[in-house]
Amino acid sequence: GVYSSPHLLRYNERVRIQNQDLPDEIHTASFDFIEKHKTQSLTYFEFSTLSALHLFKQAKLDVVILEVGLGGRLDATNIVDNDLAVITSIDIDHTDFLGSTREEISFEKAGIFRANKPVVIGEPNVPQPMLEQAEKLHCHVSRRDVNWSFKANEQTWMWQSNKVRLENLPFCQIPLANAATALAAVEQLPFDISVETIKRSL
């Protein structure tokens, strides 16, 4: 399952199961369930996050990817006790809520870290507060250009870590740095995923 935001054309884009959007009636039934059982006022994002989690629970999924809406520490998705935290980049954005420096923003993003759980960081220049939070929680940190790296050629690209080297990877529709970070995340998962599956997914 994948929960992402914002949507571009239709709300249904936010919640995908087995790479498929869900029909309107599935969402409205979930909305009704949340509305009947909520005990306090919810923001739009909190409501949609709860609905997504409800749908994922009904589907009995093995893996769920939750995209943080804003920051991390106070984000609605942070209600979930995740098994793996992924930081793609650290940019100056939403400064009214997250702080005006990369250091302040990195602290907010590090709010999704969990004690003794793996963390994958795709940002090459990691601010100290994020590293300190990972150390404080005894997280296993996998960092770009430290634990893994990638390089593009003319027609393909390669990715390597301390454990494995993947060559002749096809280019995909997302930024290469994000794809490389995703591969670093895959390496942390307790699943045996073949190189063929990785190439097909890219």
Model feature map: region roles:
Residues 2-80, 96-98, 104:
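ATP-dependent carboxylate-amine ligase catalytic core
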Residues 21-26, 162-170:
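Short amphipathic beta-strand/extended segments with alternating polar/hydrophobic composition
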Residues 38-41, 167-173:
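A short glycine/serine-rich beta->alpha loop
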Residues 62-67, 82-166, 173-199:
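Acidic, Mg2+-coordinating active-site environments of NTP-dependent enzymes
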